[in-house]
């Protein structure tokens, strides 16, 4: 089957990119590819059998027209000016059979005009982390970019140490970022901001294109998508680590996996990025940061969208966030209805977990085994203050009884939303260290496990992290 690529971005937004081709690595070789995703995208298996090929930037497929995008942004709350694809190249936009499109974005593809002081490369460590994280999030049901392939090489890349150069093929319906809009707003080119908005609406919100109120309705949906995404992050204990405006997806996708982390111990102020000295991007601050970023996007639209309309959309953010968060947390607790005491019960559990440094994922998974008429629970042994747990657990079981739902039905619901497996940093690190020694077994094994996060397991993937694996802070270097 021949893949079809189109050039909408190149044709319709000429001010937003520089055309250039990838720079191949030395002795590049394909070490992993996503068979399930490749099948979804109707990619012939033969493309994965001919060396690095397109996956290593050595060849282009017919119809591809590679380019590096320019954008700007606020980083850690400070205007950073022009940024852009410093090591990534958009190879093309695949046209799928249903009429939708999928960007093919090659990360680590070499120098671009937007590399600034960088070398245009990515390292094996970071490409493995992004591949694992994006696929983990996908199978958790959270909107995200996807990973299609990883190529490693003999090219040395200099970070804190010398690491092997690598490339990741990332795919997504769009790589539109808040930073694209900021770039032209701060260059005082509002007509180009409007062109970006029109492009987004035409291709991703086409049902609004003929509406005279399209910009307000579109921005309201961007706000809602962002609020929903952040709510989902919070419910699974995901910390992004670097929520700069240039890392914010217009479509509400999780984008740019760098120093991310999933909670081990429940620590609301968890900081996964060792460069985040002020804790701006701490776990509990993510909802506020996302709203701040939306305000920056709204500012770029103010030349052609009424400020009152923008503010109305921004004002809806918190309610959308709380609605999505509340719905999912009630499911995680096994509540079939909404009762006034639900928030208090959840907050009391969080307080107890924070005091005891309880494991976030394991706590909710074990809670899924609760029998409403039995005071016995395997979760009890996870707490030192048994009296405090017993008091909370008795009230929790009383709340479950109000719903008049069988244990089996409720447990099934809870186990479908409380994962047994999340991508803990130590699991990723173990796969990385093996891969850097040439052994890809653990990389493939972990990828396969992450496809079924809600299935029961009895291996170390679902155990508490070892001492060395706790509080692994990660840098932005990739």
UniProtKB/Swiss-Prot annotation:
Q: What InterPro entries is this protein classified in?
A: adnlytase_SelO, SelO
Give the positions the UniProt entry annotates as the active site: 246
Binding residues for ATP: 84, 86-87, 107, 119-120, 170, 177, 256
Keywords associated with the record: ATP-binding, Magnesium, Manganese, Metal-binding, Nucleotide-binding, Nucleotidyltransferase, Transferase
Q: Supply the source organism's classification.
A: Bacteria, Pseudomonadati, Pseudomonadota, Gammaproteobacteria, Enterobacterales
Q: Which PANTHER family match?
A: PROTEIN ADENYLYLTRANSFERASE SELO, MITOCHONDRIAL
Which organism was this protein described from? Escherichia coli O139:H28 (strain E24377A / ETEC)
Q: Would you identify the family this protein belongs to, as annotated? A: Belongs to the SELO family.
Write the protein's name.
Protein nucleotidyltransferase YdiU
């Amino acid at each position: 089957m021949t893949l079809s690529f189109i050039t909408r971005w190149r044709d319709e937004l000429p001010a937003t990119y520089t055309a250039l081709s990838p720079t191949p690595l030395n002795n590049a070789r394909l070490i992993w590819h996503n068979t399930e995703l490749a099948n979804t995208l109707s990619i012939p298996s033969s493309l994965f059998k001919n060396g690095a090929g397109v996956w290593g930037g050595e060849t282009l497929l017919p119809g591809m027209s590679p380019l590096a995008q320019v954008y700007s942004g606020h980083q850690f709350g400070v205007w950073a000016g022009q940024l852009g694809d410093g090591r990534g190249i958009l190879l093309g936009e695949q046209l799928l059979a249903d009429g939708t499109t999928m960007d093919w974005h090659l990360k680590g593809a070499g120098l671009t005009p937007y590399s600034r002081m960088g070398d245009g490369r990515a390292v094996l460590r970071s490409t493995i982390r992004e591949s694992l994280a994006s696929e983990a999030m996908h199978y958790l049901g959270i909107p995200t970019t996807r990973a299609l392939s990883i190529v490693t090489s003999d090219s040395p890349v200099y970070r804190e140490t010398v690491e092997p150069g690598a490339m990741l093929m990332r795919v997504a319906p769009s790589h539109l970022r808040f930073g694209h809009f900021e770039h032209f707003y701060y260059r005082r080119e509002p007509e180009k901001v409007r062109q970006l908005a029109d492009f987004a609406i035409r291709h991703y919100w086409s049902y609004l294109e003929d509406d005279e109120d399209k910009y307000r309705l579109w921005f309201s949906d961007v706000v809602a998508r962002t609020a929903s995404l952040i709510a989902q992050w919070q419910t699974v204990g995901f910390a992004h680590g670097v929520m700069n405006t240039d890392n914010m997806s217009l479509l509400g996708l999780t984008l740019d996996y760098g120093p991310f982390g999933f909670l081990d111990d429940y620590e609301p102020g968890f900081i996964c990025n060792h460069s985040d000295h002020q804790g701006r991007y701490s776990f509990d601050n993510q909802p506020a940061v996302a709203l701040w970023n939306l305000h920056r996007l709204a500012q770029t639209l103010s030349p052609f969208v009424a400020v009152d309309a923008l503010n109305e959309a921004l004002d809806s953010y918190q309610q959308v966030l709380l609605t999505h968060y509340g719905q999912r947390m009630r499911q995680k607790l096994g509540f079939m209805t909404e009762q006034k005491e639900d928030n208090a019960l959840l907050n009391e559990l969080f307080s107890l977990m924070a005091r005891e440094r309880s494991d976030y994922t394991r706590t909710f998974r074990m809670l899924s085994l609760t029998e409403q008429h039995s005071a016995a629970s395997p979760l009890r042994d996870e707490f030192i203050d048994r009296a405090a747990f017993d008091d909370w657990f008795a009230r929790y079981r009383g709340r479950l009884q109000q719903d008049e739902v069988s244990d089996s039905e409720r447990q099934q619901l809870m186990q479908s939303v409380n994962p047994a497996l999340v991508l803990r940093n130590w699991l990723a690190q173990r796969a990385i260290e093996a891969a850097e020694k040439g052994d890809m077994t653990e990389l493939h094994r972990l990828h396969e496990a992450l496809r079924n996060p809600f299935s029961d397991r009895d291996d170390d993937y679902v155990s508490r992290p070892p001492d060395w694996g706790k509080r692994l802070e990660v840098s932005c270097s990739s």
